[in-house]
């Protein structure tokens, strides 16, 4: 009823390998009802069915076989343009948003020429595609896979005689093809260049953008008791963050211990690892978007720690999703029963909806959220308190950047 509403198109996680838009946590009912938006969830071809690059070895017949998983997303966005008015949506106010692999999808779609004009805002949550898969890497993976199947380049039609189970079993059952590259391939056509390297994509220069991450992304991976011994922590910092330089690893550990004196070893490691991966990627996307000098971008950081498992998982990968969708009751196994979660869910879901409505996430129930600049790195912190902070991890960010430059 009334005026056409902003449209929010959700792209699920799973790293282009697995997942679905139908998970209960992604139910858009409350987001649509409370924030007066239309929510669309998308499922598409994944894994080897969505990202097997046959264009180079297969000739003309297979020329458009590349990136069909992402082509599905473009088709879905075109469907939204053609049909969303029938559902009360505004085709001129479409925002794509996604988490993990879904953040990779939104950031890569910004670099797809055929997607230009199909959306007007983009949000990447704990995921990004700064660089795509090169055609050489994709071709090498296909060759290993076809060799395992005993199929030659001029016999690609034989693939269509196989069952999906045979295709998957061969892929995952053969060490020779483990690590098969899955995701957007730089084919020179559908995706002409690396999405965000060396600069933000020009096709979406006028599209407002938001990106962020959670504080301890990997907290969902480690098994109980979620702890590391001192020697394990030193080894983790040395091999993963310090280019095998033990002195640098010790200096990083000291840096994080001084900032978080009450944190266990495991939580310190998870915080540093997330700073060096998902958080760095979100900051980098915002930097590149800012340097483009067109539409604004906004940086956030989710650092509310779940009480589940005695707070030992921290602010882990996927934890922000029920707050964005205002589904904290549906996801009580993730969020626990803290009453504050309702307040945080309101603030976050309203910010995401405000961004979809106007390209600006600000609303009356939160502090002023300034657009990103490289001078101040303004960041909206969603934690036990919602607050706007300039460059909250500056010291750690610069220390990790210095190590990166040595690699």
Residue ranges of predicted features:
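Serine-hydrolase-like catalytic core of hydrolytic proteins
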Residues: 1-156, 173, 189-224, 275, ...
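Hydrophobic, repeat-rich solenoid/adaptor surfaces of innate immune receptors and signaling proteins
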Residues: 11, 355-356
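Short, internal active-site loops enriched in acidic
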Residues: 13-15, 100-103, 164-166, 304-308, ...
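Short, solvent-exposed turn/loop segments enriched in Gly/Ser/Thr/Pro and often Arg
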Residues: 45-48, 97-101, 301-309, 367-373
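Substrate-gating cap/lid region and adjacent catalytic-acid/histidine neighborhood
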Residues: 161, 165-342, 351, 358
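Mature extracytoplasmic/periplasmic domains
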Residues: 362-390
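Tryptophan-rich aromatic "cage" segments
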Residues: 385-407
């Amino acid at each position: 009823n009334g005026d056409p509403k902003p449209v929010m198109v959700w792209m699920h996680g799973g790293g282009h390998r697995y997942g679905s838009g139908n998970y209960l946590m992604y139910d858009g009912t409350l987001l649509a009802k409370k924030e007066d938006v239309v929510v669309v969830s998308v499922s598409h071809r994944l894994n080897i069915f969505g990202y097997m690059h046959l264009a180079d070895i297969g000739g003309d017949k297979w020329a458009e076989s590349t990136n069909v998983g992402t082509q599905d997303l473009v088709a879905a966005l075109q469907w939204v343009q053609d049909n969303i008015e029938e559902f009360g949506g505004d085709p001129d106010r479409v925002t794509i948003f996604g988490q993990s692999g879904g953040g990779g999808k939104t950031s890569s779609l910004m670099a797809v020429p055929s997607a230009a004009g199909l959306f007007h805002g983009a949000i990447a949550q704990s995921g990004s595609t700064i660089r795509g898969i090169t055609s050489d890497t994709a071709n090498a993976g296909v060759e290993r896979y076809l060799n395992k199947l005993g199929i030659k380049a001029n016999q690609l039609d034989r693939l269509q005689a196989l069952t999906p189970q045979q295709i998957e079993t061969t892929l995952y059952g053969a060490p020779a093809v483990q690590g098969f590259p899955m995701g957007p391939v730089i084919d020179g056509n559908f995706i002409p260049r690396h999405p965000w390297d060396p600069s933000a994509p020009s096709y979406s220069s006028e599209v407002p953008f938001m990106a962020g991450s959670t504080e301890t992304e990997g907290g969902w991976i480690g098994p109980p008791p979620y702890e590391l011994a001192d020697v394990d922590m030193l080894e983790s910092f040395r091999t993963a963050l310090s280019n095998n330089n033990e002195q640098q690893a010790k200096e990083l550990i000291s840096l994080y211990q001084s900032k978080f004196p009450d944190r266990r070893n495991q939580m310190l490691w998870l915080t540093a690892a997330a700073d060096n991966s998902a958080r760095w990627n979100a900051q980098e996307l915002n930097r590149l978007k800012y340097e483009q000098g067109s539409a604004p971008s906004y940086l956030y950081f989710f650092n509310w720690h779940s009480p589940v498992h005695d707070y030992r998982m921290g602010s882990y990968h996927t934890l922000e999703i029920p707050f964005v969708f205002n589904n904290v009751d549906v996801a009580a196994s993730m969020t626990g029963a803290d009453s504050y979660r309702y307040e945080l869910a309101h603030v976050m879901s309203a910010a995401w909806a405000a961004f979809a409505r106007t390209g600006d996430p600000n609303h009356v129930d939160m502090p002023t959220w300034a657009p990103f600049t490289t001078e101040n790195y303004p960041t909206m912190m969603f934690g036990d308190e919602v607050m706007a902070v300039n460059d909250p991890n500056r010291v750690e960010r610069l220390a990790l950047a210095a190590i990166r430059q040595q690699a």
